Each structure stands twice: as structure tokens, then as C-alpha cells.
Amino acid sequence: MSSRLGAVTATPGPTSLKQQRSTRIVGAKNNRAQCSIKDNSFQYTIPHEDSLSGSSSASSCEPVSDFTATLRKSTYWMKMRRIKPAATSQVEGAGEKEKERAKGKRNVKQEEDEDYRELPQKKHKLYGRKQRPKAQPHPKPQARRVRKEPPVYAAGSMEEKWYLEIMDKGSVSCPTCQAVGRKTIEGLKKHMENCKQEMFTCHHCGKQLHSLAGMKYHVMANHNSLPILKAGDEVDEPSERERLRTVLKRMGKLRCMRESCSSTFTSIMGYLYHVRKCGKEASELEKLALKCHHCGKPYRSKAGLAYHMRSEHGPVFFPESEQPDCLKEMSLEAKGGGRVQRRSAKIAVYHLQELASAELTKEWPKRKVLQDLVPDDRKLKYTRPGLPTFSQEVLHKWKTDIKKYHRIQCPNQGCEAVYSSVSGLKAHLGSCTLGTFVAGKYKCLLCEKEFVSESGVKYHINSVHAEDWFVVNPTTTKSFEKLMKIKQRQQEEEKQRQQHGRRRSLRRQQQPCMEPPESQLEPKAGKEQGGNEELVGPDPEPVPAQPQKAEPAKTTHKRGRK
């Protein structure tokens, strides 16, 4: 310590502080350089930024025993500056110790990994993670599985036969009903206890079924093509269609019952159309074809024939023999005079009807055209039921409700039907079951089928019977006759105007075409006259030939302008 204190210049003297500081820095640098030369094992020089005094640096170079302190200082500074020292004996020893520590850490980690494989909870505990202790399930006592021995039945008994059938096929059917199958003999015996009732036998195929519901389903699914017959072996079409409708509702489709045909249908009309022609030869199909009695063209359906009749031969009219009794009174043929109406007259009536509908829509736009053409029920092909009558006050109230709330509710108690128009509410009240009014149904006069709505019966007559739902009335009213006379006058005037315009256009086209032949004929006539004059006698007067030469120039001038 004395040597260190003696080396330090304690007395400042007259020199300034800057000079003292510079001398200290220079002395420290020299001492560090000497230390690095003396000890080759330590080659690191402390940078000049450190705040060591000159005395400490000078004393570090005197003995070797004091060098350990400087070495410790240098390693400390090296660690602070993150600089790796050179390889020395001491450093090598420290490196070996560190390697041993790393190996120990690796061994510990391996042991932890092995423990984690066996018990994964251990690793979480080592790393300080909290984990709830899981309740270990109680180990179940491992009982020996005893293989059941096959049951033994008496030789030749029914149980033995059933058991052999189960082993062979997987199930055995009930010997009573032959419809139910079981996989065990116990289950079969339990079924046979309840299977002692009388069986339901299908009268179509002879199959026996256990329940009435099963029999109904069997008939509906497999025998839906068999028609329902009346007393005289006639097909009852309304009940037959109703039965097919229920089959279609439950099964979702109608299946053709021919073995060679696998067609299915989702509509009754398509099914009936297919059944009528399925499995029949071409000759039989030709007999079933409907032929037009005007031109003899064959059609497969009534709808196709009706469309052909309307488009090619005017409206559809059936002869007197095929007309039903309920429509004979409304026949279109004249009864009093005994004269049969011709086809051209029928077509004229049809066209008059179209003209009348067009004129009525122009003259009375708010009035229904069909109501004017078919005013009374005697000319309809269906009957209308009685509809309820409403007072003007009720109708006015309903109209105001529609303007305010845009809807009307049915006035009957318990009915929640809502409509957006008065006509819809009227139609609903005619068929509402919660009210006091009991209304009938719309009935088709051609097949006596009933419908709930008028649009339904109209569609039925047009599609099924391929006819109009009303009969055209050949006798017209006075207003209708006036309208037709006015229409005929307008048509005649239009025709006259067209003819007059055509004549004028033809005259205009013929005038420029006729002028050149006249001009060509005149000089020829002059030449002939000149020749004749020469023959007859000398009369040289070429006066008419000169003005004719000027005319072709005019024609050429006109052509140039064109």
C-alpha cells in the first residue's frame, strides 16, 4: 500500500488540473504495455476509458504475486464487456468445469424426459406448473371371460330346427304368419305368444298379414292399379280417383303393376294415361287413338285433339249422339226449323264471339266480358252452389278495413282466416265450416264431379273433358248486333281504302313505263307512212319526224335526273 501511495503525486503544485490528468493517463498506458510484454499468457489490454489511477497500474507490473488482482480485474471487465478471453491454463480449467456442469444438466434433462414419458405430470411439477391432482380410477378386477356354451335342445324338436336356421341364415321367421323374423329363439317364442290371432288374407294375391294396417298398406302399395267397380262391372271413376289420391298422398308415388314395367308417377293423370297404353301393341294403340272427324288426323289425348280442333277447325262441338242428357237442351242446332247449322256458321259464331269480347272490353272496361257472353246458368256446363248474401253496409265496412289495415279477417268465431280482398273473403265464407251458412259445391255436368271452387271446375272441364266450360249462344242481343254492324262497316271502309290505295300505286307505276313504248311506236308509224307514201306517190313532208327526235333527249334527261 505504501508503494502505491508513494507513486501517486499528492501535491498538486502550480500545475493545472488538466496537466495532472494527462500525465496520469500516459503513465497508465505505459504500465499496461509493459504488463502485456512480461506475461505472454495475458494479452488483453484494458481500454483507456477505465478510471484506474496511475499508482495502481504501476504497482501491477512489479511482482507476479500482485498480478492475480489485475487478472481478476481484467476478467471482470471482460465479462462486463462480453468478450471471450484467450485460451489459458486457468481458462481451460474453467472450461472443463463448465463442460462437466453441462453434461450434468444434460443427464438431468434426459432423466426428466424419461420420467415424463412414464408420468407426464412430473415435468409440469419440475417446471413449477400447477396442476390439479387427478383422481386415479380404481383398477377393475380382471375377471375371466367365460365362453357361453351353445344351448342344447332335444333332438328333432322345433327349437333345434329354429336354432339351426338361425345359425345358417341369421334369423328365423314365424311359422304362423311367415312375416316376422327373429334372431333368437326366446324372441321368436315371445312373438308367437301374441301371434295367435286370425290372419288377414289378401284377396288379390292370397298373402296373409298379421294386422289390418299391414293389409291396407299391402293393398295400397302392391294392388293400387285395380279399379273400384260398380254393381254393373263399371268403373266408378270418382271413387277410383279418390283412392288413387290417398295412395299418392301416403306412398308419394304411383307404381305401374306390370312385372316388366318399373315406371312410377307422381300425378294421377300421368298414371292413368300410362296404364291405358302400357303393354299394348301398336295395333291396339291405333284403335285407342282419337281421330278428328273433319280431317281424320289421329291424336293420343283429348287435350291434343281439342287444341287441333280449336286451331284448325274453329270451336269444339260434339255431335248430338255423344251429347249428355243434361246438355241436350242447350244444343247449338236449331230445333224449330229443322235445319242443321253448318260448320261455317259455327265458325262464324266463334269469330263473332271473339269480336264481341274485344268490343265489350273497349266499351265497358269495368264489366266482366264472360258475364256478358254467358249471362245465365242455363248455358254453363257446371252447376253453381248458393252463396251467402251480404248487405251494402257490411261490404262498405270490409272495403274501409282493406284501405286501413290492408286485410280482412273472417267474421266467424274461431276462424283465423285473413284475406286481402273482399272477393276472397266472400269465397271463403261460402265454404267456411265455422259459420251458419251451409254452401254446396260446384258440380261438373259432364261427369258429376264436385269441386270447392269455380276455377277448379272450369280447369277440370277444360283439361279432362277438353271442352269449353260454357256453351256459345248463337242468338245475339240488340246491342251486340249494333256492335257487329259497326264493326262490319269499319272493316268494309278499311277494305275500300286499301283497294283505292293499291289502284293509285299501280297507276303511278304504270305511267312512266308506258311512255317509252308510245314514243317508239310513233317513229315506226312515221317510217311506215313514209314507205307507203313512196309507194303511193311522191309526198315528201318530213315534218312530224323532227319533233319526235327531240323526245328521246327528254327521256334521257329524265333518266339522268333519276
Curated annotation (Swiss-Prot):
SMART domains: ZnF_C2H2. Its main location: nucleus. It is found in: Nucleus. Keywords: DNA-binding, Isopeptide bond, Metal-binding, Nucleus, Repeat, Transcription, Transcription regulation, Ubl conjugation, Zinc, Zinc-finger. A zinc finger (C2H2-type) spans 200-223, 290-313, 442-465. SUPFAM superfamilies: beta-beta-alpha zinc fingers. The keyword Ribosomal protein does not apply. One of its GO terms (molecular function) is zinc ion binding. The keyword Translocase does not apply. Residues 122-147, 498-507 have a biased composition (Basic residues). There is a cross-link at residues 18, 84, 230, 335 (Glycyl lysine isopeptide (Lys-Gly) (interchain with G-Cter in SUMO2)). Coiled coil: none annotated. InterPro entries: Krueppel_C2H2_Zn-finger (IPR052274), ZNF512_C2HC (IPR048408), ZNF512_znf-C2H2 (IPR048403), Znf_C2H2_sf (IPR036236), Znf_C2H2_type (IPR013087). One of its GO terms (cellular component) is nucleus. Residues 1-32, 86-150, 489-562 are annotated as: Disordered. Residues 12-23 have a biased composition (Polar residues). May be involved in transcriptional regulation. Belongs to the krueppel C2H2-type zinc-finger protein family. This is Zinc finger protein 512. It comes from Mus musculus. The lineage of its organism: Eukaryota, Metazoa, Chordata, Craniata, Vertebrata. The gene is Znf512.
